[in-house]
């Protein structure tokens, strides 16, 4: 039987007035269905939920809601990547990525967690990180993250889920803890609180070349 761990976020005195409401925590419109054919440890954080795969040592997916108010947060990132304390040992560490040639690529981006000190700190848990091509992480992937924030500011709320895709049965591994390197990444964005909801899906190869928007997979409802 698959191990499924759940931890509800504790309220923090460090959270700003933009902290999530009870309705946000309970609704979780962005959460994918539970996996049945893949190892899964599900953990609910202050700002996101992660389905972690202990075989690949990366998430299956990470999902979160981003609101207009949360984009106004001022919490600064500290770049302190740490093992996830709620995962079984041995745990992925910061050093597993050192000199690997890959970035420590956030799934739920730190810039989406500026509304809470705790949310910001938890975004640097290694369970929220994947080996990501440096150019992809800093260009196309980062550009889409900024687009999502602009949509949150425009529409009020966006629901986001993303994660790695492994095309090979035996993917490349890095580090002492043998972290699997994804072949691709997906991101799904839902803008629900409008007359005609919009859903968009994006696929990125884990490579250095620029991937123009026309190569993405788009799923859009009638506007």
Walk through the language-model features, giving the residues of each.
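Domain-level detector for secreted/extracellular nuclease and nuclease-toxin modules, and
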Residues: 1-220
């Amino acid at each position: 039987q698959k191990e499924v761990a759940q931890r509800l976020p504790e309220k923090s005195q460090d959270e700003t007035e933009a902290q999530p409401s009870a309705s946000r925590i309970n609704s979780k419109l962005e959460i994918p269905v539970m996996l049945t054919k893949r190892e899964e440890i599900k953990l609910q954080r202050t700002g996101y939920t992660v389905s972690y795969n202990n075989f690949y040592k990366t998430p299956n997916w990470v999902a979160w809601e981003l609101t207009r108010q949360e984009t106004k947060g001022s919490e600064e990132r500290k770049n302190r990547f740490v093992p996830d304390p709620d995962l079984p040992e041995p745990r992925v560490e910061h050093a597993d990525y050192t000199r690997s040639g890959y970035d420590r690529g956030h799934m739920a981006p730190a810039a989406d967690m500026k509304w809470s000190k705790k949310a910001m700190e938890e975004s640097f848990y290694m369970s929220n990180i994947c080996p990501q091509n440096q150019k992809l992480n800093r260009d196309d992937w980062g550009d889409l993250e900024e687009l999502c924030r602009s949509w949150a500011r425009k529409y009020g709320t966006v629901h986001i889920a993303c994660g790695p895709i492994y095309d090979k049965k035996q993917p490349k591994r890095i580090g002492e803890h043998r972290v699997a390197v994804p072949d691709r990444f997906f991101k799904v964005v839902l803008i629900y609180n409008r007359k005609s909801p919009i859903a968009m899906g994006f696929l990125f190869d884990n490579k250095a070349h620029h991937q123009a928007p026309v190569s993405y997979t788009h799923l859009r409802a009638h506007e």
